Amino acid sequence: MLDFMDYIQLAFAEGTNWNRDNSYSSLTATAQSLLDFSTPERLRVHLSSLSTPNFATSYTLGTVGLIDGSVSYLYSTVPFTNTPSRSALIPLRKLSPGYRQVAPPSAPIEDWNLDSILDNPQNVQPSFASKPTLLHATLHLPPPTTLNALFLRRISPTMHLTLAVCSTRGPPLSKSAPQASLLMQLSHDTGKYSNEYLFSTDNALFGWRGLWNFGPDPRSSTDTAAPRLSLLSAGAEAYYSPVSSLIGMSTGLRFSTLPAATDVPASTATGFATANQSTPISTFPYTLTLTLTPLTGSLSTTYSLRASPNLAFSSRFGFNVYSWESEMVAGCELWRKSRKQDDGLEWARRKMRASEPLSLPSLPAESKERQEEEEATDSVLKIRVDQSWNVRVLWEGRVKELLVSAGVGLGPSDTAFAWMYIFSVRAGLNR
């Protein structure tokens, strides 16, 4: 389950219209969410708050064996007025990553009109209207004290700058300066392709990541053009450190259906469409990826599909051409809808729906209703198993006003363990 600060950072990316899917680092995001989730190993309590539309705080306390905690603060020039901040109102799918529908590439917005994006024209400051900025700092206690700081800034409609600092205090009797490292990342996204340039002071590491989308350029597409049904992307990454002579590289492909592929054509709203026209291009969304690391000889393929709005499956097969070792992992997630309050009028609604003509429903209304139905979930169950019969089970859901995560890991050589992880968000009480 995502921390509250990570949730706010995702809201910042969505509010500033930054496409997280158009990046090589997100090539296998869906498979990683379904197969590489971790089960909690200790009791941890989070108390977070969005005290103002621009300022958020978070406190963490961990127990069982070792008591530790952290204090986090976040400030954004973009207000989060319309972002749900109470644990009872936040959609669970925002906090528990699962199958993620890849968004179609879009052209960058040349005129940043954040007033219309966030529907909050009163609180947007003109000095930051063109360059949204986010500041985040976390102090981990007890000693050794670690400070993590993050700086995000949209330099231009196509440029995104990220600065991350990590500093760890040395032993109490040591007179040496605290160890610190800086990671700088500059992202450039045009919709058709994206590039990321990285530099880390740790071993003077330089890096590059790039992604190319096949098909028409969204910058030259018109509003009357037919929506794309699928997306094929190719990308690569490379790293080099002159200090440690470290070299790394990988390449990958991704094919994914887009939302338009599973939608019923608009011509069916009139009721005169043929049988072929009323059938969607794909019965369910799916994503396929292929990644290759030439230096280590590792090859990995993933296949993820969303069989229904509340059920998703994923599998991964990895093979090493040098050692002949292989890996097979399979997993799924099952969402549970929240029970609707029965007002005794469901019989009347069914009768009204049966008597309505076929021309009344429209595609936007169906899409909105489907989205609201998907967000009306209060728990999710994730299961994964590998070729060695190591099983992980994770449950995340709501208990009263708390968001709770509990998991168990079972294996032939490991003792079973089960810990509970509690994540509580109590915010917006003063607004």
Curated annotation (Swiss-Prot):
Function recorded in the entry: Component of the ERMES/MDM complex, which serves as a molecular tether to connect the endoplasmic reticulum and mitochondria. Components of this complex are involved in the control of mitochondrial shape and protein biogenesis and may function in phospholipid exchange. mdm10 is involved in the late assembly steps of the general translocase of the mitochondrial outer membrane (TOM complex). Functions in the tom40-specific route of the assembly of outer membrane beta-barrel proteins, including the association of tom40 with the receptor tom22 and small TOM proteins.
Region (Disordered): 358-377
Assembly description: Component of the ER-mitochondria encounter structure (ERMES) or MDM complex, composed of mmm1, mdm10, mdm12 and mdm34. Associates with the mitochondrial outer membrane sorting assembly machinery SAM(core) complex.
Primary gene name: mdmB
Species whose genome carries this gene: Aspergillus oryzae (strain ATCC 42149 / RIB 40) (Yellow koji mold)
InterPro entries associated with the record: Mdm10
Main location class: mitochondrion
Compartments reported by the entry: Mitochondrion outer membrane
Protein name per the record: Mitochondrial distribution and morphology protein 10
Biological processes per GO annotation: establishment of mitochondrion localization; mitochondrial genome maintenance; mitochondrial outer membrane translocase complex assembly; mitochondrion-endoplasmic reticulum membrane tethering; phospholipid transport; protein insertion into mitochondrial outer membrane
UniProt GO cellular component terms: ERMES complex; SAM complex
Protein family: Belongs to the MDM10 family.
Signal peptide: none
Disulphides: none
This protein's UniProt keywords: Membrane, Mitochondrion, Mitochondrion outer membrane, Transmembrane, Transmembrane beta strand
Topology within the bilayer: Multi-pass membrane protein
PANTHER family: MITOCHONDRIAL DISTRIBUTION AND MORPHOLOGY PROTEIN 10
The record's note on its domains: Lacks alpha-helical transmembrane segments, suggesting that it resides in the membrane via beta-sheet conformations similar to those predicted for other outer membrane proteins and porin.
UniProt superkingdom: Eukaryota
